[in-house]
Amino acid sequence: MSLSRVSVTAVRNLHPVTFSPSPRINILHGANGSGKTSVLEAIHLLGLARSFRSARLLPVIQYEQLACTVFGQVELAEGGHSSLGISRDRGGEFQIRIDGQNARSAAQLAEILPLQLINPDSFRLLEGAPKIRRQFLDWGVFHVEPRFMATWQRLQKALRQRNSWLRHGTLDAASQAAWDRELCLASDEIDEYRRAYIKALKPVFEQTLSELLDLEGLTLSYYRGWDKERELSAVLATSLQRDQQIGHTQAGPQRADLRLRLGAHNAADILSRGQQKLVVCALRIAQGHLVSQARRGQCIYLVDDLPSELDEQHRRALCRLLEELRCQVFITCVDHELLREGWQTETPVALFHVEQGRITQTHDHRE
């Protein structure tokens, strides 16, 4: 799948624009502050209904504008196309349109337009809180396991109910037991989906990483959020008093984590920023392979400032892996000459110059 047309209005410093990207490689180049990253942010908004640059919406909406909007036409892997649109206003409200109809949730966008982001903050996947790694894991499971979303919603409902009565004691014993049973059932299913996903991801990740970096001894493991030797029901019973004291459930899938270690150490404590970036690239490219296998389609990759922290050898290796995915890629850089030799002659590559918020398509960089 790929975006064949993108229209952006009132996103940061971008002038209203409609452009037609290449179905393969798109390089957006220009000076710092020209608006290159804002183009990626607009596409990210279209696919996930949120920004990757700010948790707050207001900075995304152009000054003195009431809302920002992004529209896109997606060429589907199975043929045909789908039209997507999103508008977000200053009050935080958003409207999603899919093929002319109102949609209820951002998950519907994500299903049609699976996006992968690689940017200078990618190291947070290794260094950041477990929540970031759970989001990475669950993004992957969502795109390969059709039952995941419904089970996830059951889990969240049961968890909210349990946490509410832990804080307020509003449920009788029978209701408490019923919600605990539902929580345990949904938790076991989520754990099963996650374990199956990690089992499929690990060999693809290891192979991908070996083409980017020689890191003997790097291991990827999964912690499910409670003792692997015990049933969750037993863990919840044991920790009930403590859960009541702090007002929330300590054990369960909401505490899961991915652990990357190099020997006896956390990988984030040992690796340089450049090495961390390559590890994250390998993880995200591996996810792309699994999406392709499960959906007979491809992710779309948003790569912000690709040359950052990578030498020429590693830039070329990363470009080669992205090219082998045969997917659509949007890459930003200051100097497109740094990426000139990264692609096969037959691969379509489109150049877009971004200057003061205006986007101009130039030419295939080999012309």
UniProtKB/Swiss-Prot annotation:
Q: Where does ATP bind?
A: G30, A31, N32, G33, S34, G35, K36, T37
Query: Is Cytoplasm set as a keyword in this record?
Result: yes
Q: Tell me, which GO biological process terms does this entry list?
A: DNA replication; DNA synthesis involved in DNA repair; double-strand break repair; SOS response
UniProt KW DNA damage keyword: yes
Annotated Gene Ontology cellular components are: cytoplasm
Q: Name one Pfam family in it.
A: SMC_N
The source's superkingdom equals: Bacteria
MF terms from GO for this chain are: ATP binding; single-stranded DNA binding
Query: Where does it localize?
Result: Cytoplasm
The family this protein is said to belong to: Belongs to the RecF family.
Q: What does this protein do?
A: The RecF protein is involved in DNA metabolism; it is required for DNA replication and normal SOS inducibility. RecF binds preferentially to single-stranded, linear DNA. It also seems to bind ATP.
Under which name does UniProt file this protein?
DNA replication and repair protein RecF
Q: Supply the gene name.
A: recF
